[in-house]
């Protein structure tokens, strides 16, 4: 009997080390940044069983077999659609400003589609304005509405949006609503999905969270886009979820969420429409390619409109394109660079680019919320402050709520707004969308918003920051080490 126990123990020990060796090899063979690989290996070696399970759940980009197959199947038709769109030459910009030229070239080469001109654009800086505008535009819809959000939380003006959507669906407007399963969990537990479906709205739960399938698909891969498309002509996107801040996360202790949304009219809606169609087909298998814009009847403002490039990121889209876009934007700065983000956990490349810009004499501002809804990300963000401050970056901690706006403004001319946080999940994992606007008028609008944020912020003084308690530095370094995993 003793011999049997000994054999069993040796077999278990051998299996244990074989499992660790196998996962280690798997980590090393995947193409990833060295800091990320080292962080995963540290977790696996310190807490082997917990580390292995965590890695299998969250360590690899896995869309799931069915979605991955759909993602591959949709590209031939999508590529043909993009080629057909290029035939509408009047909607594509042929010139860009000096600061924007490299970024637009990058996006065109990586995505196959250039910047679109002739768009009218309005920056909505309050959730009330954005929600009321949505209610109005949805009520005017004639043909179709496509909506995708990470979070849909009932309450306040959001309920008016829901009622408007159901009303137009009842009169025959084709309405599609796709919401992330994790972000909109409260919505899917509410009566609204049944009410909307009864009204004729096609409601889809994206990337369904299921404990039975945790090892078959990465559970923290989320549908993080925020888009509303109306009649293939009106479009919205930005940092705002479908929530009324007066009713959203009031017990989090961070104040109301502060966001921006962009309302657009013009061919940019077509570019956003193909992104939605890809997401919809990946999730449902249904192909819904948007119609090409009719340049003969749509009132595109060729002379006064904005030039916009749409960047889509996530599984099935050009890998790393948003990361490249941010790097290109930062290195293009010559006078001023202003960035706002709720979560500041940049890659090494982005960190060095920001520091280099400041050391070249560019006036660099980063605006982050003083109080964050994620303790882990809050500590990890502070771990980068010392290096940024030493390089000459001005860091502002916003005190008027949870600043959720994601924006970049380069030299007052080149603007980036959308859903992308400066963290690893947004940069490399989630389905995201970013608008690139080459226009000094829009840049002036965004600058006014950012200046208001700065006025409501506290500037971090390097000397004061250097005197923070030693225990805080220890906690910061701990989270800094694991920042590639956040």
UniProtKB/Swiss-Prot annotation:
Its EC number is 2.7.8.-. Pfam families: PLDc_2 (PF13091), PLDc_N (PF13396). It catalyses: 2 a 1,2-diacyl-sn-glycero-3-phospho-(1'-sn-glycerol) = a cardiolipin + glycerol. The keyword Cell inner membrane applies. The active site is at 224, 226, 231, 404, 406, 411. GO terms for biological process: cardiolipin biosynthetic process. HAMAP family: Cardiolipin_synth_ClsA. PANTHER family: CARDIOLIPIN SYNTHASE, PHOSPHOLIPASE D. This is Cardiolipin synthase A. It comes from Sodalis glossinidius (strain morsitans).
């Amino acid at each position: 009997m003793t011999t049997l126990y000994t054999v069993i123990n040796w077999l278990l020990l051998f299996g244990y080390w074989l499992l660790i060796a196998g996962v280690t090899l798997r980590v090393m063979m995947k193409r990833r940044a060295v800091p990320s690989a080292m962080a995963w290996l540290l977790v696996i070696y310190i807490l082997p069983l917990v580390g292995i399970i965590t890695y299998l759940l969250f360590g690899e980009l896995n869309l799931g077999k069915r979605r991955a197959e759909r993602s591959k199947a949709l590209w031939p038709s999508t590529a043909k659609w993009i080629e057909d769109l290029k035939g509408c030459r009047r909607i594509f910009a042929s010139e860009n400003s000096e600061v924007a030229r490299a970024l637009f070239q990058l996006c065109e080469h990586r995505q196959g589609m250039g910047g679109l001109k002739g768009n009218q654009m309005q920056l909505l800086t309050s959730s009330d304005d954005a929600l009321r505008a949505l209610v109005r535009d949805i009520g005017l819809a004639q043909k179709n509405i496509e909506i995708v959000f990470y979070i849909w939380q009932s309450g306040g003006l959001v309920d008016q949006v829901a009622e408007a959507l159901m009303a137009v669906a009842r009169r025959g407007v084709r309405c599609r609503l796709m919401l992330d399963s994790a972000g909109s969990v409260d919505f899917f537990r509410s009566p609204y999905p049944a009410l909307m479906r009864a009204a004729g709205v096609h409601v889809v739960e994206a990337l369904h969270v299921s404990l039975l399938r945790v090892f078959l698909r990465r559970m923290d891969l989320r549908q993080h886009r925020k888009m509303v498309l109306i009649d293939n002509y009106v479009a919205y996107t930005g940092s705002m979820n479908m929530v009324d801040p007066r009713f959203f996360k009031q017990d989090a202790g961070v104040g109301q969420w502060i966001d921006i949304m962009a309302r657009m009219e013009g061919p940019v809606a077509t570019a956003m429409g193909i992104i939605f169609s890809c997401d919809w087909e990946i999730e449902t298998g249904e192909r819904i390619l948007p119609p090409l814009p009719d340049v003969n009847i749509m009132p595109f403002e060729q002379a006064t409109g904005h030039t916009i490039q749409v960047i889509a990121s996530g599984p099935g889209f050009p890998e790393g394109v948003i990361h490249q876009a941010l790097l290109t934007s930062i290195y293009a700065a010559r006078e001023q660079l202003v960035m706002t983000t709720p979560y500041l956990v940049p890659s090494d490349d982005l960190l060095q680019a920001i520091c280099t810009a400041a050391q070249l004499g560019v006036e660099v501002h980063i605006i982050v919320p003083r109080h964050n809804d994620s303790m882990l990300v809050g500590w990890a963000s502070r771990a980068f402050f010392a290096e940024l401050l030493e390089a000459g970056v001005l860091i502002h901690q916003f005190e008027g709520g949870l600043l959720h706006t994601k924006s970049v403004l380069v030299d007052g001319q080149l603007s980036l707004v959308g859903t992308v946080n400066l963290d690893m999940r947004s940069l490399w994992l989630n389905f995201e969308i970013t608008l690139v606007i080459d226009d000094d008028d829009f840049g002036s609008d965004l600058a006014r918003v950012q200046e208001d944020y700065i006025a409501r912020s506290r500037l971090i003084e390097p000397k004061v920051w250097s005197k923070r308690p030693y225990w805080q530095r220890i906690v910061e370094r701990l989270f800094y080490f694991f920042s590639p995993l956040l």
